[in-house]
Amino acid sequence: MPHPLLPDLETLASATAAGKGYKLCCVQVFTHLIPMTIQVQIRRKDGSDVSLDDCAHFSASMDEALEASQLFTEAYVLEISSPGIGDQLHSDQDFLTFRGFPVEISFRDHDSDLHQAGLLHKRSDEHVHINIKGRIQRIPRKAVTCVRLTNPTG
């Protein structure tokens, strides 16, 4: 059953996207997650690719619009993406932009390929830091083979 506020949320997201040069693709509300997750997918009006920076900028605008609308009184996580957007983080800006987002880190440890999932905390010169159930784990950058955004909804 769709969330009762989904039509209002779609209207708000569509207006916010249009004002920033994007068009709305999809809005989903996942109430089974704690906190609730609101996923918004956007595309550029001109058809060009949406970058990670575009998602971050739109996230700020959408968050302001949500707060001003007072549609939701409970806590929520806002996720902005685009169909087909690249999910690997490479640049320092990527790591700053997606601080706090769910990630999976692939790395090598003593000839084994390992994976850790958590919330991106930061990347320093020596380590990638992720929050796993409230504890910060440091993974040496030399060992990291890939850091990619994940979707907490599965």
UniProtKB/Swiss-Prot annotation:
GO biological process per UniProt: ribosomal small subunit assembly; translation
Claim: Calcium is one of the keywords in the record: no
InterPro entries in alphabetical order: Ribosome_maturation_RimP (IPR003728), RimP_N (IPR028989), RimP_N_sf (IPR035956)
Subcellular location: Cytoplasm
Main location: cytoplasm
Keywords for the protein's UniProt record, in alphabetical order: Cytoplasm, Ribosome biogenesis
Cellular compartments per GO CC: cytosol
Function: Required for maturation of 30S ribosomal subunits.
Family: Belongs to the RimP family.
PANTHER family xref list: RIBOSOME MATURATION FACTOR RIMP
Protein's name in the database: Ribosome maturation factor RimP
